[in-house]
Amino acid sequence: MSETINTAAQFPSFEKPTVQFNEKGWGPCELPDTFKDVPYQPFSKNDRLGKICDWTNTSNNDKKYQNKYASSFGTGIQYSYYHEEDETTFHLVDTARVQKPPHQRGRFRNMRNSRSGRGRNARGGLNTHGMTTLSGKNVKARDPRHGRGMGKKFGHRGPPPKMRESSVAVRADWASIEEMDFPRLIKLSLPNIKEGVDIVTCGTLEYYDKTYDRINVKNEKPLQKIDRIVHTVTTTDDPVIRRLSKTVGNVFATDAILATIMCSTRSNYSWDIVIEKVGDKVFMDKRDHTEFDLLTVNESSVEPPTDDDSSCNSPRNLAIEATFINHNFSQQVLKTGDQEPKYKFEESNPFISEDEDIQVASVGYRYKKWELGSDIVLVARCEHDGVLQTPSGEPQFMTIKALNEWDSKLANGVEWRQKLDTQRGAVLANELRNNACKLAKWTVQAVLAGSDQLKLGYVSRINPRDHSRHVILGTQQFKPHEFATQINLSMDNAWGILRCIIDLVMKQKDGKYLIMKDPNKPIIRLYDIPDNTFDSDDSDDGEGDDEGFQQVYNYAHNKI
């Protein structure tokens, strides 16, 4: 009997394996199923272990980077774990922090740990860790987790930026009527407004002392404290405007109020103006006992003063100091004394009575009217600070103001004592950047008053830390209209903004309204407020209507 033998069961079979051939490179062409979807982080055995892997890095398929296949070992070191105390739940606030000088700012600007494949430490970028060995302290400073360096710059840690406070708290019973943003206001224009016509002139002016034109840094002069009363009277408390409102005009204001509205697009801080509409007449007022009359300092600066009331360099304390300097400077540069000649207007100062024996600041008031079209006649009180005697004998009226230097290092400015005599243009350009709104207001007030000259004084602290003693370092004068062109101030646009607000109020019913600049946005809002708003503040003072215009300030005895 024959027997069949199965050789296949006795001997192992040989199957030909499939060999992958990569024609375009080296290595396998396909990824085995075992290793699919497994994240991979490039690494080196010399790297310290920080985390398992990082798959958040986006792939870069752009072929224009020649070094995209460069080694990216060490890219995960920025995510390494450092055993330290947890500081994520709190932050320290140093009120006495000294700001870095300008040359130290932005020193880590080009050392960002970008994940886009283009920055340092990223794939295709410059690998700084492969080139430089950093100490633990330096690595910590560049680590975004620690709230210093880049982390603080990009806002990952630290307190949020402080929001500015509104000049007045908006109440629940106020109705918002209109919002006007700055881009729309900048486009307004009201051309061909003629010069104002004088209606009434009041007050007495003293003549300017030309010796102050020879002051320079090497021949500085101390700023004196002048014991004189300065009246800051609002529109409805002005007895002359009350008298004129019965026969002339239908819109009434002061030059300070008009300048605030006309230069509103340059303002950053919040302000408010109360408007009353009675029939076809509109009265623009400032609220009593507010900071409306204080001069801002570095309002338009890239780095405004820090909001710390305990510091002499806080915005409010600097405003008080600037107002103190401005009023004392405007009186010191005049020829004072009983024997010195004075320029007297037709009427006496309307804010003092004949029986009062007080020293009043040199000021001349012009009550002028302007035709704004559409039967709108504006009547406003404007001011001169001094008068200059020309060789021909004709008087030239002056608006005298003062710029003040408080701390050039903190203000990111230029040293006046080094640049004022040789590069006065650079000093003025820096002031135009930091105080654009204040200088524009002064220019508008000089134009409205019809001043022939705008005199600017440069006043600085004797010591940057002492805000009570100052010196005059120099003076400079301009023609108001030429200076307006120099600072890019368009009077057509200023009149257009004013006319826009007047038209909005004229369309409303009789009552009380308030326009306010938003403290944090470039917006002006118009509110309809109850008629008794702010009346409670006036009644507490116990002053009658006849004494309302006697609001005065004595800047010689102010404690700053």
Swiss-Prot record:
Keyword line: Cytoplasm, Initiation factor, Phosphoprotein, Protein biosynthesis, RNA-binding
Phosphothreonine modified-residue sites: T128
Any one of the GO CC terms: nucleus
Compartments where found: Cytoplasm
Keyword 4Fe-4S: no
Entry GO MF terms: mRNA cap binding; translation initiation factor activity
Region (Disordered): 98-166
Chain positions covered by the region annotation RNA gate: 291-305
GO biological process per UniProt: cap-dependent translational initiation; formation of cytoplasmic translation initiation complex; regulation of translational initiation; translational initiation
Skewed-composition ranges (Basic residues): 100-121, 147-156
Entry function: mRNA cap-binding component of the eukaryotic translation initiation factor 3 (eIF-3) complex, which is involved in protein synthesis of a specialized repertoire of mRNAs and, together with other initiation factors, stimulates binding of mRNA and methionyl-tRNAi to the 40S ribosome. The eIF-3 complex specifically targets and initiates translation of a subset of mRNAs involved in cell proliferation. In the eIF-3 complex, eif3d specifically recognizes and binds the 7-methylguanosine cap of a subset of mRNAs.
Complex and partners: Component of the eukaryotic translation initiation factor 3 (eIF-3) complex. The eIF-3 complex interacts with pix.
The family this protein is said to belong to: Belongs to the eIF-3 subunit D family.
Domain notes: The RNA gate region regulates mRNA cap recognition to prevent promiscuous mRNA-binding before assembly of eif3d into the full eukaryotic translation initiation factor 3 (eIF-3) complex.
Protein name, entry field: Eukaryotic translation initiation factor 3 subunit D-1
